[in-house]
Amino acid sequence: NLRVPPTMDTREAEEKLIAHLQNHRPWNAQVECEPLGTGEPYMADTSGSAHVKMQQALAAAYGVQADEVALSADGGSIPLCAALKAAHPTTQLVLFGVEEPICGIHGPNESVDPTEITAIATAEALFLANFR
């Protein structure tokens, strides 16, 4: 499954990837590509009340001011996000994960600092308690 950032056309990226694979075959290897479907990327609108409340919850959990918590609209290559937004256009989607700069997320040596897990769990609990 090919995931692309929200600013990229999914089908165009798929075509370019297939062309690249077919044009860069080591030792004349045979390459066959059969696209099975694509998931559309998603870009969040971080101005909604859910993002504001999550920013406040993260700030409280990490012991910083809310303006020190950066909101980002990226990470929306998860196809489910675009499908949910298409089905429920007014719904606010807030994505966050348990990771820190040196955790090696999705890598073979992925390792998350336990204090990060505690902080994220605290932020989630605060968000759920305060979001209406």
What are these regions (language model features)?
Residues 1, 6-16, 24, 28-132:
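An extended, acidic, His-containing surface patch that forms the Zn2+-binding/catalytic region
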Residues 19:
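Short edge-strand/loop segments of extracellular domains
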